[in-house]
From Swiss-Prot:
Similarity comment: family membership: Belongs to the sulfur carrier protein TusA family.
Protein name: Sulfur carrier protein TusA
Pfam families: TusA
Source organism: Yersinia enterocolitica serotype O:8 / biotype 1B (strain NCTC 13174 / 8081)
InterPro entries on file: Sulphur_carrier_TusA, TusA-like, TusA-like_sf
Recorded name of the encoding gene: tusA
Gene Ontology cellular component list: cytoplasm
Length: 84
């Protein structure tokens, strides 16, 4: 079985940061990425379980996967790829 989180183009460590910092860092990082690239976000703020999916919907990025069963949470976002 392949781990979807294994080979992102970029990784963002947001451990220890609290709202709104993780989403602000995601936005800044995604700005410097090419369409189609993937970003692995690692966070432990419970607000990210709401904020990261909301950011993806609002900014037309695709949330490929999320693992929020325990901390640290992991999210895999694909830039500029609106969910179908």
């Amino acid at each position: 079985m392949t781990d979807i989180f294994a080979n992102p183009d970029k990784t963002l460590d947001a451990l220890g940061l609290r709202c709104p910092e993780p989403v602000m860092m995601v936005r800044k990082t995604v700005r410097h990425m090419e369409d189609g690239q993937t970003l692995l976000i690692i966070a432990d703020d419970p607000a990210t379980t709401r904020d990261i999916p909301g950011f993806c919907r609002f900014m037309d990025h695709q949330l490929l996967a999320q693992d929020t069963g325990q901390t640290p949470y992991r999210y895999l976002v694909k830039k500029g790829a609106k969910a179908e």
